[in-house]
Amino acid sequence: MRAACVILLASLTVSVSPGGQAQALPGEGDPSLDELLQLLRSMLTQMEDENHANGEQTEWLEKRQHPGKREEDGGRLRRQHPGKRLSLEQVMLEEPSEQSELSKRQHPGKRYLMLLHKRQHPGRRELQEASLAKRQHPGKRLCEDWSETGCDPASVLLELLDRSGAEEKRQHPGKRLELEDDLTEQE
């Protein structure tokens, strides 16, 4: 709107200024200042009426919105963190105490077997630590099923002692063959 007014005023000053006038049509006199002001007022009121008709559109164009807080259909929809995306139905169905616990990230090495529903004194957490399952590296698993014959506690301890004495360094798979060949040649 301001730009249109500036253009209109600039054109009026050019047309009224001496030397800037074009040849007038025959039968037309020079417009008086009152006529020019009346023309200007009518044009401005016409522009205001057009702006009121397109008022919603101009407000939408003028007001920039944050991409995560766009207003659609009167309600505000917010984007969520990709790791915490839950549908509205899921959030409403869950209990409030579980919502706070489920939304928290956990250490990758520990998986909750059951949710802890309330915070406890730090000294009492050790009792609950037994309910947490510690993840082990797949190559380092000793016994997955303790009912097997080789998985009694005594044999596991003996195996650990044997491993600790002969610590082997992991090597590139292609180099292992060369070392095995060297060992067989030395014998």
Swiss-Prot record:
One biological process term in Gene Ontology: positive regulation of gamma-aminobutyric acid secretion
Signal sequence segment: 1-22
Residues with PTM Proline amide: 67, 82, 108, 122, 138, 173
Any GO CC annotation of this UniProt entry: secretory granule
UniProtKB keywords: Amidation, Cleavage on pair of basic residues, Hormone, Pyrrolidone carboxylic acid, Repeat, Secreted, Signal
Disordered as annotated region, ranges: 49-148, 164-187
Annotated TM spans: none
GO MF term set: thyrotropin-releasing hormone activity
Regions of compositional bias (Basic and acidic residues) in chain numbering: 60-76, 164-178
Compositional bias (Basic residues): 105-122
Compartments in which it is found: Secreted
Main location per the UniProt record: secreted
Modified residue annotations for Pyrrolidone carboxylic acid: 65, 80, 106, 120, 136, 171
Pfam families: TRH
Its biological purpose: Functions as a regulator of the biosynthesis of TSH in the anterior pituitary gland and as a neurotransmitter/ neuromodulator in the central and peripheral nervous systems.
Similarity field: Belongs to the TRH family.
PANTHER family per record: PRO-THYROTROPIN-RELEASING HORMONE
Protein name: Pro-thyrotropin-releasing hormone
